[in-house]
UniProtKB/Swiss-Prot annotation:
Lineage: Eukaryota, Fungi, Dikarya, Ascomycota, Pezizomycotina
Cofactor: a divalent metal cation
Comment field on protein domains: Contains a pseudo-UCH domain. This ubiquitin C-terminal hydrolase (UCH)-like or ubiquitin specific protease (USP)-like domain is predicted to be catalytically inactive because it lacks the active site catalytic triad characteristic of thiol proteases, with residues at the equivalent structural positions that are incompatible with catalysis, and it cannot bind ubiquitin. It functions as a structural scaffold for intra- and intermolecular interactions in the complex. The linker, or PAN3 interaction domain (PID), between the WD40 repeats and the pseudo-UCH domain mediates interaction with pan3.
Gene assigned in the entry: pan2
Family statement drawn from the similarity comment of this UniProt entry: Belongs to the peptidase C19 family. PAN2 subfamily.
Assembly and interaction partners: Forms a heterotrimer with an asymmetric homodimer of the regulatory subunit pan3 to form the poly(A)-nuclease (PAN) deadenylation complex.
Protein name: PAN2-PAN3 deadenylation complex catalytic subunit pan2
Protein source organism: Emericella nidulans (strain FGSC A4 / ATCC 38163 / CBS 112.46 / NRRL 194 / M139) (Aspergillus nidulans)
GO terms classed as biological process: mRNA processing; nuclear-transcribed mRNA poly(A) tail shortening
Amino acid sequence: MEADWNELLRIPLPPPNPHGLPTVATTIAFDDVSELLWAGNEYGRITSFYGPELQRYTSVRAHPVAEGPVRQILFHERGVISISSRSVHMITRRGLTQWHITHDEITDLRCMSFTAQTNKIIVAGCQKAMFTIDIDKGTIVDKLRTEHNYVLMKRSRYLCAATDTGSVNALSLTDFSVVKSWKAHGAAVNDMDARGDLLVTCGFSIRQTGSPIVDPLANVYDLKTLSPLPPIPFHAGAAYVRMHPKLQTTSFVASQSGQLQVVDLMNPNAFKLRQATVSFMLGIEISPSGEALAINDAECFIQLWGSPAKIHFNEMSKEVEFADVTPRPPQVDWSPEIPLNVIGMPYYHERLLSAWPSHLLFEVGSPPAPIDPSIVPYLRSGEMGQYAANPKKTRRYQVENTRALASTEPTLIAPKFLSEKAREQSKKADDPVGDTAASLAGARISGESEDDPLLKYSNVEIKYSRFGVDDFDFRFYNQTCFSGLETHIANSFTNSLLQLLKFIPLIRNIALHHAATSCIAESCLLCEMGYLFDMLEKANGQNCQATNLLKTFSSFREASNLGLLEENLTNKSLSSAIQAVNRFFLGQIAQDYRRIAPNSEELDMRLATIASESIRCMFCQNEIVRPGNTLVNELMYPAIDMKQARRNHTLRFSNILRASIEREAQNRGWCHICRRYQQSVMRKTAHRMPHVLMLNAAINSPACRRLWTIPGWLPEEIGIVLEGGQVLCFEGEDLRMRIQGQMPGLIIYDLVGLVAEINIPEHQKAHLVSFINVSVSSRERETRSKWHLFNDFLVTEVDKEEALRFNQSWKSPCVLAFQVRDARHMVDDTWKNFLDTTLLFRDWSLNNGRPVESRVMLSDEEKPTPGTPVALDTEFVDLEKAEINVKADGSQEIVRPSKSGLARVSVLRGSGEREGVPFIDDYISVKEPIVDYVTQYSGIKPGDLDPRTSPHNIVPLKVAYKKLWLLLNLGCVFVGHGLASDFRKVNIQVPKKQTVDTQYLFFHPSKNRRLSLRYLAWAVFKEYIQEEPADSNQGHDSIEDARMALRLWKKFQEYEDAGIVGQILEEIFREGSKLGFRPPPRNGVTTVLSRPGTAVTMQNNSGRNTPSTPDVGAAASAPTTPRQAFRRSIALTPSNGTFSGPGSGEFFTGSPLK
């Protein structure tokens, strides 16, 4: 290591997916053929980096996620070889797979090495066999039995292999027999390297207290004489070692704290020291040239060390092959005026494939007929496959046309877009009933369909028109007053569980009371649940989205490590995934609750089963008792004989629940008295039952699944008594008798609902739904059950028998929720009286940035009250571009619309002495990649949203959202232009009585046009706003837009008081049609910004393109004002309350009142 050696570069290992967090590198290695550095991660992915700049070159998923991390990487002239616990994989350096090897006896691979033959490798691990693999053929050529568990391998004069007990074996390179063995370290070998005749090892020894500690010595062995040499002292703890590739006696030794020592093994007193800036080092690797050193640390970074003037990885490297530069296509003058035959067709000399003769067309590979689901429960295993009795539903030798069956499979027909309905209504306004009938033709989602009763259980999918999601008719899927949740959001498979938690009154109360506290932690899942539950209640049947909550859920490293995120569900059933998410949600709720109330037992009383676990050694009878509290109980099933299931009372749901709470199991465990593993008995004793009993169905065998098929097996109510440390559980007639007898200590639980997995093979992929008895959480005192199906945004009422029937093979229960009967209808809204409004009256910043000078915080005298008007405007940036599918006919279908992120929030006073003065002007910290700042329209520039570089006041999304949520629940009335778009992107639901949208105030009933704020400002006040600045880095000012919307509202009030609203609107639209609804040029120069698509009649300046509708007679759901004088504006709004559209507008010389 020369004097100028230092850290040259530090890069994070790329995350496993675009929305994931960086992960640590489980192994790193320098390529000895090309100028590449390779790294593997814990998701089975290997990534390469090119040159000293570590430019990302290739990234390949080499092993399934379920196999865990990449353990080691080796290099061959033909490619790169990697291993995980259960497979060996080889790729080319460009990322193409060469071969992939698995074997029944490959269970836990740890290491590999080349043998004496350069075209063969040997792989080993903590298993009973080693395997020799031919690299050229990609096959296993030999299997070798071994008594040792090997964790590391290095090849030199011998094949040096380290065991998991701290020994190092020198193996023969020919037959792999043990030539010599050393007990190198007391506990384990952490790292080792061999080169020439020397072997150096680092490892751990056991302290007197029993915990391992890094040895302060690096052991050295002579492979020529097979004898140990004097060790190398390293007081910081020798954790990692690498031999220099050129200097045979020089070694790099490193500690876990980052201390590096370059030492001569023959002269330990001659050494050089360096200190790497790491919190915890995970490994080092030296390049074949000896001029570069890579360090892997626990903060997911890879550091590159070396001399800036000399660094290179290999002395002679093959040229790295990069992707070919795509030639630019020739310029073609493509316009409607140019005939297509001018372009011409390529010359051909053979017959075209499109002219394939019809007599050579054959139908092959017809899919087999599906198995009748009614016979699946009766299948029995045979010598080959399974068999069952013939149900005799078809004729003998009858053949089914499976292709025709697949093409005529009934599906849930998507409704027409709202814009299509609006156009049809304008053409045929006298037949609204016919239009509704046409929209609903072919499918019904409530009740039993004539074609297929399973349609309501199908996957539902949002279709997008050019106007975005607001053009989709959600009311087609939901005619109830309960809101559904949208899909097309990462991890939206949890929608069903979130709906279930919302309808449990006690959990709903906890979440809302917590959200009303001073908690502003970004990762607080309980706050996000409170916001979501409040939004679902205020929506009153309109569709909602759990964007903010799911974004918080995705940010948890624990959720990613446990494989709970959508990207990790490839090899995992949805049933087991949602049960794991249920455990995670409730555990995280408990942590979030204790963050504000650490000493409160309220959460334990409501959710936790207070219990203790006793573990008794069956040999010495020693017993250990420890707490065994749990938030979720897993059902445990005994051995089941279906012939006796109906008559055997031990197989009733109540008895299985009792055995699950008082679980008892036998297994082997460590006994500190016997000082060995002994057979032990674990028994759980419950001391207090919770108010909310959450259960995971845990169906893990066909026998357990058949138990649920018994009609009425799942009761709608159960009774539990804790008596003398035992749990007694009752159901059915037994429970009714004890209720009549007023049994002391009896706790009655009602079934609130359940989450079920729906897996209908002919109805797309598996998904989750929830069945919920909404009467439990209703505010009206009623005892009749009202069961509803929640299938994402499809919500419909079902009867109790259908909800609790599981004799269909495609419907399986996953999560159950019971609540004490005393808490029925206990919907607590007192949290609104205890809102912590501190956030509205004090500054909060991530970067101590300075807000705009005009912003003045609210004073105590200005505390908002119900009806207080505030002006709102927001700005957004693009996080993802729209995904568009171009069909064969050239038409385009929007598969997924663009995704926006909140970037700025401005809120102004709407009344008082400081009317129009902002009291909130926050820029939002955005952690996701931003694909477009849309500076011209948002005014947001690169760096504005980064707390490290932004000159503005930066706050987390949670803080900005909570401020708006507080204003909403304080009863403020929001004034703005195109508020529907702002509210949707902020992900907040505002009742119609609390919105004043100037887009609807200045709307003419007979005009198919929504006027832009820019045009209205000129038309009413003769003022120019949103003008194109001289500097392209400038853009809209949200404070200016909010203030203009406020002024327009005030002016509209003047028009109403004067009774001239109709006259004003007529004049505005008459003059606007002459000017194209744009302000005239200032001084003859056009200065108005024009968004793309301004030629379209239905537009939206607030960033939300939605259609308008000419039918305004039934405008029941448009935004309105809180004043009685705004009845006319209600009549001017379109149905569904979601239409808003930009127009580019202009007109009019000012108010006629002047």
